[in-house]
């Protein structure tokens, strides 16, 4: 019985050590300034899915996942007045590049 209790305690310890913080807030908006870029969620986190909505009616922007210094383009781009859904791997960040001459407001929601 003592060994069983020790085993259970070790399992709980291992599970709790692997728990990564969740991204907060779960929804909101941000602006990508004209001809600029922004990086989001550049912190330790578990894998999550994200929904991005471009509120600009004329301009698109490029979205990338960055992990371990490697940048991967999300296809298709975040088109004008459209949405994009994708998964962000554990401890990866999202890089958004705005090539247009207008600021782009993006709404987001996270499912983790």
Task: Explain the meaning of each model-derived region.
Residues 14-16:
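C-terminal motif of bacterial Sec signal peptides marking the signal peptidase cleavage site
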Residues 25-38, 70, 79-81, 91:
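Tight coil/turn sites that cap or link beta-strands
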Residues 54, 85-87, 92-112:
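Short, exposed beta-strand-loop hairpins at the edges of beta-sheets
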